[in-house]
Amino acid sequence: MTINVLFLAAEAEPFIKVGGLGDVAGALPQAIYRSSKTASSKNSVDIRLVLPYHFAIKQKGLKPKLLGDFYVKSVDGPEPCQVYYYDQGDIPVYLLDGDPIDEKSPVYSSDPIYDGYKFVFFSLAALGLADFLNWRVDILQGNDWHTATAIYALKTLDITSPHLSQTKALHTLHNLPYMGFGVQKALTDYGLPAVKTSILPEWARHAPLPLALLTADRIVAVSPHYAKEILTPEFGCSLENFLKTRQSVISGILNGLDTEEWNPETDPLIERNFSVSSLTLRRENKVKLQRDFDLLENDEIPLLTLISRMDPQKGIDIALKGLEYIEDLPWQAIILGTGNPIIEKMAQDLEKVYPNRVRSVIEFNNKLAHQLYAGADIFMMPSRYEPCGLSQMITMRYGCVPIARATGGLVDTIQHVSHQVNGGTGYLFTRPYPSVFALTLKRAIKHFQDKKKWKGIQHNGMSIDFSWEKSAQKYIKVYKDLVK
């Protein structure tokens, strides 16, 4: 039996990437297709990726094939949608275009009304794609608020298409706070019915994401722990009571890591390649960092790093303030990232306070990020919330030991170091306070002095399989359950 999956996303590598969704949508469909073709799989999956034909994609010069067009209904009359096809090998890719997808706009603009029209149009056009292709859709998979309207429309509009008559809706939840507010007028103008149920709070009835969470047959959060957290007041964004009514259809599947791009054995962006069996070579990467940043060249001093978007969610202030609590201990730190000007200034100010041990690099620098993963000893990830997280997987794969807040996917991926000789892959702290972070970091620095224990922690982290295949197999199981 072949399961047909229409996978909708606002972005996907290698076509367009703005954030983490681009990584997921670029890698997951490919992994699902590959996993479904293995001898152990009883179901083949025909998964097709659908993206808006953003201006940024057009600039890449890919030259997709124009297949034709069809019309999307709106209260002002039908709107044309052009369908382009790009042959990506195993996964067919469809790029949908139309007037609401303005050629001059970015993928995500600062105007929620404009983005609302663009993504509501795209979501409804994606439903029309089934008839255009004469292709039965077994699973419609949405991602975040941008494609949530497709889920809601499938379940609430009077859709007569035989290709959608048995379709099940699965919505993947990447980041609950981003619900798509400001989209109400677009929903009305495209004929989406108002929500009348009292289960969903009044304030949430006009945003696409809550509407998808209300109507989807299955909801998959991007980590098992995050699937539990969204049911609590701290992480539920005032939807926790509503989400508890949907608890039976909520589960969590951890995102994967592109293990070809992030491979210390072959990474062309680092000074010295290494593996678990040649871990001593890793030191050359640390030496390069210390020399490049004019830090004391001493392998006995732990080199800390933090690579992140400068955003309050990431808890960077927790780490920066926490370092001041342990100024009497030996450490060096390199901070890399850009974003919120207040947090950027905090990083720069810390360098002024500790000019011999702190370096702040306020920019996006992919090459430096690779080198930091490969050369630093300890990775700081004090996120206030982290639905899945990617950096902790990379850092462990590169032999850099993470210290992270015990939240979301960080709980699912980091095994807290115990008092045993070789237990764990990193360190977790519970409360998001600088003092608590500092105590955990102090413990890690103490363990760093014990070379046998530290090497064991590195080995544990580097030995974990974070590939997308594990995630893909779990999604295929969800597909099977839905089409039974």
PLM ranges: what are they?
Residues 1-484:
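Catalytic cores of nucleotide-sugar-dependent glycosyltransferases that transfer UDP/GDP/TDP-activated
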